[in-house]
UniProtKB/Swiss-Prot annotation:
Gene expressing this chain: NAP5
GO molecular function annotations of the record: ABC-type transporter activity; ATP binding; ATP hydrolysis activity; ATPase-coupled transmembrane transporter activity
Protein's recorded name: Probable non-intrinsic ABC protein 5
Localization per record: Membrane
Topology within the bilayer: Multi-pass membrane protein
Record family assignment: Belongs to the ABC transporter superfamily.
TM stretches of this protein: 212-232, 259-279
Keyword Secreted: no
InterPro entries hit by this protein: ABC1_TM_dom, ABC1_TM_sf, ABC_transporter-like_ATP-bd, ABC_transporter_C-like, P-loop_NTPase
Chief subcellular location: membrane
Domain ABC transmembrane type-1, residue spans: 222-324
Any Pfam family hit: ABC_tran
Length: 324
């Protein structure tokens, strides 16, 4: 692993504090759905994985949609304009405040490229694009004024209740610090939800085969299956021996039995072997179907009665693989 690039990517994607919060840092298993992560954290992790690949061409499809404005500005500055300054980046976005930094701007309308060129050139030549930029700036101004008014109201309340807020803040910090110290002093290792599977190596034990054999009807069909197989083999050997003994070697040698007797006995042996193989196959299919049904029902019963920790630790993909 390139540790230097790894640290740069973590810093550019604002993941340092997130890794500190996680119990096992960057070794925390988050599962197939990104458990314990918010939408913004997932998005920044995806961006970090792409940045670490150190490719020549990057394609971003509105990557800052799940993050706030401040984080989006940081990602654009540190990631796209920082780490990827020497790369070819195709950036698709609705956030027009990032367009002045682009080398080439393509304006899409109804699925087609309506304008192409530098940001300032398009802004001067295109009325639609100018209206879009103006509407975006007006919306930013409205949001900024609303934020400023809320901040002023909060500051006024802080001045009126400053002592009370300071006391509450001090107590809250002290309590959180005490809880943190208690967790550190307890010394109990935290457990990950998704754990690595344990696999047994070696040959399959005999009791496993015995449980499988006796699962269908308590193993009552097994003797009949073996008997059918044994009778089939005996009849096959008998029919071959009968044909070798009853068939004359040449025309000069007299046959030990009549031709009709030879055919009747051979047909009887063939019919008996066919009947045995039919019975064996029927019993084998019945036992196999019953065993598979019992295993499936037991598996469903265990899954439905399992605690929530099992459903978190075992992902849906693994459960489906085991079920198949």
């Amino acid at each position: 692993m390139d540790r230097e690039r790894y640290d740069k990517v973590i810093e550019a994607c604002s993941l340092s504090k997130d890794l500190e919060i996680l119990s096992f840092g960057d070794q925390t298993v988050i599962g197939e759905r990104g458990i314990n992560l918010s939408g913004g954290q997932k998005q920044r992790i995806h961006i970090a994985r792409a940045l670490y690949q150190d490719a020549d061409i990057y394609l971003f499809d509105d990557p800052f949609s799940a993050v706030d404005a401040h984080t989006g500005s940081h990602l654009f500055k540190e990631a796209l304009r920082g780490l990827l300054c020497s790369k070819s980046v195709i950036y698709v976005t609705h956030q027009v405040e990032f367009l002045p930094s682009a080398d080439l701007t393509l304006v899409m309308k109804d699925g087609r490229i309506s304008q192409a060129g530098k940001y300032n050139d398009i802004l001067i030549s295109g009325t639609d694009f100018r209206e879009l930029i103006g509407a975006h700036q007006e919306s930013l101004a409205v949001v900024g004024s609303a934020d400023a008014s809320s901040v002023s109201e909060n500051s006024a309340l802080d001045e009126e209740n400053g002592v009370v807020r300071d006391d509450i803040g001090f107590d809250g910090k002290q309590e959180s610090q005490d809880l943190k110290n208690d967790k550190l002093d307890s010394g109990e290792p935290q457990r990950q939800f998704v754990q690595e599977e344990e696999r047994a190596k070696g040959s399959v034990a005999l009791d496993v085969y015995w449980k499988y054999i006796t699962l269908a009807y308590g193993g009552a069909l097994v003797p009949f299956i073996l008997l059918g197989q044994i009778l089939f083999q005996l009849l096959q050997i008998g029919s071959n021996y009968w044909m070798a003994w009853a068939t004359p070697i040449s025309e000069d040698v007299q046959a030990p039995v009549k031709l009709s007797t030879l055919m009747v006995v051979y047909v009887a042996l063939a019919f008996g072997s066919s009947l045995c193989i039919l019975v064996r196959a029927t019993l084998l299919v019945t036992a196999g179907y019953k065993t598979a049904t019992e295993l499936f029902h037991k598996m469903h019963h265990c899954i439905f009665r399992s605690p929530m920790s099992f459903k978190i630790a075992k992902t849906c993909s693994k459960t489906c693989i085991y079920s198949s």
